[in-house]
Amino acid sequence: MAAMAPGGSGSGGGVNPFLSDSDEDDDEVAATEERRAVLRLGAGSGLDPGSAGSLSPQDPVALGSSARPGLPGEASAAAVALGGTGETPARLSIDAIAAQLLRDQYLLTALELHTELLESGRELPRLRDYFSNPGNFERQSGTPPGMGAPGVPGAAGVGGAGGREPSTASGGGQLNRAGSISTLDSLDFARYSDDGNRETDEKVAVLEFELRKAKETIQALRANLTKAAEHEVPLQERKNYKSSPEIQEPIKPLEKRALNFLVNEFLLKNNYKLTSITFSDENDDQDFELWDDVGLNIPKPPDLLQLYRDFGNHQVTGKDLVDVASGVEEDELEALTPIISNLPPTLETPQPAENSMLVQKLEDKISLLNSEKWSLMEQIRRLKSEMDFLKNEHFAIPAVCDSVQPPLDQLPHKDSEDSGQHPDVNSSDKGKNTDIHLSISDEADSTIPKENSPNSFPRREREGMPPSSLSSKKTVHFDKPNRKLSPAFHQALLSFCRMSADSRLGYEVSRIADSEKSVMLMLGRCLPHIVPNVLLAKREELIPLILCTACLHPEPKERDQLLHILFNLIKRPDDEQRQMILTGCVAFARHVGPTRVEAELLPQCWEQINHKYPERRLLVAESCGALAPYLPKEIRSSLVLSMLQQMLMEDKADLVREAVIKSLGIIMGYIDDPDKYHQGFELLLSALGDPSERVVSATHQVFLPAYAAWTTELGNLQSHLILTLLNKIEKLLREGEHGLDEHKLHMYLSALQSLIPSLFALVLQNAPFSSKAKLHGEVPQIEVTRFPRPMSPLQDVSTIIGSREQLAVLLQLYDYQLEQEGTTGWESLLWVVNQLLPQLIEIVGKINVTSTACVHEFSRFFWRLCRTFGKIFTNTKVKPQFQEILRLSEENIDSSAGNGVLTKATVPIYATGVLTCYIQEEDRKLLVGFLEDVMTLLSLSHAPLDSLKASFVELGANPAYHELLLTVLWYGVVHTSALVRCTAARMFELTLRGMSEALVDKRVAPALVTLSSDPEFSVRIATIPAFGTIMETVIQRELLERVKMQLASFLEDPQYQDQHSLHTEIIKTFGRVGPNAEPRFRDEFVIPHLHKLALVNNLQIVDSKRLDIATHLFEAYSALSCCFISEDLMVNHFLPGLRCLRTDMEHLSPEHEVILSSMIKECEQKVENKTVQEPQGSMSIAASLVSEDTKTKFLNKMGQLTTSGAMLANVFQRKK
């Protein structure tokens, strides 16, 4: 042992707790385990330095015994291995130790070593092979080595009394087959029936060994459990402790269970049985019949009555409460001294010692009051000078200074510096956010945190402190930005700093100590958690220690090194670890002030800005936002802003740029330098154009609302920010005549949409009634659906205004002003009505109505705008401007011009963005009437139907509007004009997708059947695409049969034989819906009828009509060629139809004929392969070559086609 100890301790002391590489950690753990095994071999086997079997430099025989014949080779080897006198001890391998144990038959010690190695994951082959071989445990003759003659003391060797070797139990017996867990269960004791006593003794020895190990395990678990129960405090109770300063210490789980047990015992003893039963039910997780259920290794205390009687025998010192608004004059203090010496008899107690103790307490209180008076006078003097300075500089005096909540166990009573409440017990205006002229003593108390004042220590202790300890405890002041953000908005903005104190460690980090005494207390709390975990990647446990030391250390170089360790503590910190580090950095910043934050923390961030690991760069980005409130204002708007700008432009990790955006948002909540406005705008545009969706989302949630708040304060929201975005949209539309950049349009428009809440808040705050908005009486409730759901708390209008109550009052006055008094003198609202809305409507008219994405974006924008500004504003300000432009009247129909405004995107955006904002009956009627008028006017003027189609597509995406759309279409079905009926028939196709089958069956099918028998052929033909869509989307058998019969009548009725347009529409519909329709419908109806149409087209005389039909047949066959077609169908219909089509193309379009020949050849090859009856999935080499050659020719010919791409759009369409 003496030889081993230095090695063990030296290696243990060489572990670097700040080492971040996991491989090095594994090596250290492995080395530690190996040394532990060696030490356990000596210590666990009952050796001591004075025993005959101990391993000492004086005993050259390392692992032998005094009774064993000496082996020179072994003895010298062991002596060299374990070290001799004056020599450096050499490292002994575990395999050599195992070999020696097995050689000397110390089998239980070898078994224990084997078990330890298995638990550490390093199995030794020698021990594994030995204990897995049952033959090693058969009966043997003779005396085992290391076993002297009976009665010789001290002959146990390594397997002495501590090891409890079974071989010593019988004085000379042999060890039976009980060497390992794997062979113990299969031990056959019946084989040794010749000596029952020896067998019993050996069995007892083995069981005793296992029992001893089990007892040690149980004892260790009990100790750990008791320790955890004594120290851990639930999070909720810690929160209650923080909010209830009168509670001296939070209750622990162990204490709670013990008190529950005593209370229940008291109730039972005093016959409160029903109360006891109820109490037990409410604490069903505890067994009240067994004290051991409360806590292991804990003695049961006396009952409640005994505790109460015993409490009466103790003196309880009252709390020392000091009215900080009062003081003690020196002459009064001097007069108190003789009074103390002449105390009245009522204060005397029978014990002189207690009398002297009371005198000593009073003297200490006098000293305390003197010191408090001295400190307050010093504070008054300093505050007077600061007030004079601030008055000269025309600055407002901050009523409250940021401070950290002090540790609760360090104060006699809790103050409320953080919340701004005055601790004076005589004050009655606590918590009111009003302007109060503080007295000098009040200002001193509200500015200096209680734990920072020198009166926390008696005068005798202060006099013994070094000067630095007192001078270092100065009030920490932070630069307050000259901003007007509401507290709710400010709090919501800071919520994006990802810090955490909702854990034991987070609680320790957030309340780092600032005095010598509290450092020691904190070390006592944290060290028990650090020691067992620091080698198991729990290095965040070190954060409180590092921060406390960095906060209080007098040497700048050492502080810099500690902060460097903090930022490099974890190689790749995860989300929780980063939050813990950020929490510590903020606590550090609150204590040390802005100067040290700039000088000590920011350089650490700068060093990591280009680190190779994104987790480190993420920590830098998050820390910039978290530290923003604690930095000098000049640094916020210069260095930190530049750091974040660099990371936004250069960093390739999406997560890092997302954190940069959130930190930029926090910076925008504190920056007050107007010169940085345009730099912020450029950063905003860069963030909006970021390729990562995460970054763009963070921009809308944090950066944009914070920047808008600053813009509002500068007066630039309407005059610059919104106008600039509108101008960029207009420029995009002017330049995008040949191809609009829809991504940029979405970028700018979504930014405008995110600015709507800020714009509405500005309108409310600058309204004529804003000065009347006072909270008094009952506050009206805001409807839950009054505003659209915000993307983040910063886009909530109530957050921007300050509170939901204040917003409710403003909304009530807002609606009244719009209804009764108008907008005269209301500049911010007049700007919206007279400038913003006309410009937006003009932009809407320039959008391509066929761009579904653009129509949808502008529709959502107007919907949010109208919902935010309210129903009265929408009805009186928005709708009239649209109606003035659209002018829906049948008298104004211009058949030549097509009533141009109705063909633009203004129609769908007005219908879906404005008229759908509110869903009352009158609103729905207005929407139905508008769509009916548009459908009528477009039909009668022979104008394009794109605007109406866009409206139906946008509304049809929401099932809530399906009934409304069918109402509009039924109006068209029964209209007197065939043009309107034809338009209604075509609109059915757009409404069917996503519609329920029940609605299709009850409302759509009857309307289509009515139109299919219309006197006008054009109306009948217009129903064919809708019938095809039903075949594609519906699975109801009866409905499909009705549609099939209607289509069959179109194809087989003689009156339609010469209807070229009808045949063209049917072929186009078959090509569109065939691949997606039901297979039976496709095989039995579509393909056979296409074959018939191809045959009839061969007889067509007019070449133009023949080519038209052939072209549509080619597209239909190309789409159907990708579907599975049975052999019979291929032979009887598909191939004959292709051959008929090839006949047409030979004369009319030779380039199509080549492709058709390749398709026919490939289909024939498929049929031939099936007739050969080859195994499924296999194909001959020749067939494979032919197929590849066919594909190549087909693709080459496709590339040489001169026809439009639209004709071949469905060539490679697969069946869905």
Swiss-Prot record:
Segments annotated as HEAT repeats: 601-639, 640-679, 1004-1042
Gene3D superfamilies named among the record's database cross-references: Leucine-rich Repeat Variant
Comp. bias regions, Acidic residues: 21-31
Modified residue annotations for Phosphothreonine: T32, T183
In-chain residues carrying the UniProt-annotated modification Phosphoserine: S20, S22, S54, S56, S180, S182, S186, S385, S453, S792, S1149
Residue ranges, annotated region (Interaction with RAB11A and RAB11B): 497-779
General function of this protein: Regulates intracellular cholesterol distribution from recycling endosomes to the trans-Golgi network through interactions with RAB11 and OSBP. Functions in membrane tethering and promotes OSBP-mediated cholesterol transfer between RAB11-bound recycling endosomes and OSBP-bound Golgi-like membranes.
Basic and acidic residues bias spans: 411-435
Region (Disordered): 1-73, 135-177, 401-477
Any coiled-coil regions, as ranges: 197-231, 359-397
Compositional bias (Gly residues): 148-163
Protein name: RAB11-binding protein RELCH
GO terms for biological process, alphabetical: intracellular cholesterol transport
SMART domains in alphabetical order: LisH
Any one GO CC term of the record: trans-Golgi network
Residues recorded as bearing N-acetylalanine in the entry: A2
Span of domain LisH: 255-287
Alphabetically ordered keywords of this record: Acetylation, Coiled coil, Endosome, Golgi apparatus, Lipid transport, Phosphoprotein, Repeat, Transport
